[in-house]
Amino acid sequence: MSVRTKICGISTPETLLAAVKNGASHIGFVFFEKSPRAVQPEMASMLINRIPDHIDKIGVLVDPDDNLLERVVHAGLTGFQLHGHETPERVAFIRRTFPKVKIWKALPITRSQDLDQTLHYRGLVDRVLYDARTDGALPGGMGKRFDWRLLKDYNHPMAWALSGGLDADNIAQAVAITGAELVDVSSGVETAPGIKDMDKIAQFLQAVRLL
């Protein structure tokens, strides 16, 4: 199985280079001020200019207003990852307004019934991202994971990706259980919240290549 990887929360040239040279298929930038990984669109633009065209540039946004969406599109993003409480109606508006941008919707998962949320976004988004539900102000990047067995044999109605508590040590098990073909890692390649580690990025991507 060929598994692709999104390294999320990149904020420096050094960690960006580690992700690119070790084979990341997607690079994620966080535009949420409460996150320790937050970057301004202007900084993201400088980093995006260093990324080869074949790698997707995804912006993580939490209930963004139209002005922020315009700014991050101008920075060069190819996709939005909506990680807040965006309703299907709001997502439909974003889709109409930015027809060339790929849209992901992050869905917090605790139990099997949570997977039904996917149906509300069918036809509106290009991909859903299954992530662990968090208790705090941050919707993701907390190192928490959900029960991967919930995805075993699940009939996915659209393209999807797996996130939540992934690292180099558990990625093989996560993919074996879920069948994920795209995985998303953030805290699992950090030494502290928001501090990406080049060696951990390389180790994670090497572990994915060995699957």
UniProtKB/Swiss-Prot annotation:
Classification via InterPro entries: Aldolase_TIM, PRAI_dom, RibuloseP-bd_barrel, TrpF_fam
Reactions this protein catalyses: N-(5-phospho-beta-D-ribosyl)anthranilate = 1-(2-carboxyphenylamino)-1-deoxy-D-ribulose 5-phosphate
Transmembrane segments: none
Keywords for the protein's UniProt record, in alphabetical order: Amino-acid biosynthesis, Aromatic amino acid biosynthesis, Isomerase, Tryptophan biosynthesis
GO biological process: L-tryptophan biosynthetic process
Organism: Zymomonas mobilis subsp. pomaceae (strain ATCC 29192 / DSM 22645 / JCM 10191 / CCUG 17912 / NBRC 13757 / NCIMB 11200 / NRRL B-4491 / Barker I)
Family: Belongs to the TrpF family.
Pathway this chain belongs to: Amino-acid biosynthesis; L-tryptophan biosynthesis; L-tryptophan from chorismate: step 3/5
E.C. numbers: 5.3.1.24
Keyword match Amino-acid biosynthesis: yes
Gene name of the encoded protein: trpF
Enzyme class, UniProt record, top EC level: isomerase
Signal peptide: none
Molecular function, one GO term: phosphoribosylanthranilate isomerase activity
Protein name, UniProt field: N-(5'-phosphoribosyl)anthranilate isomerase
Domain of life assignment: Bacteria
A Pfam family matched in the record: PRAI
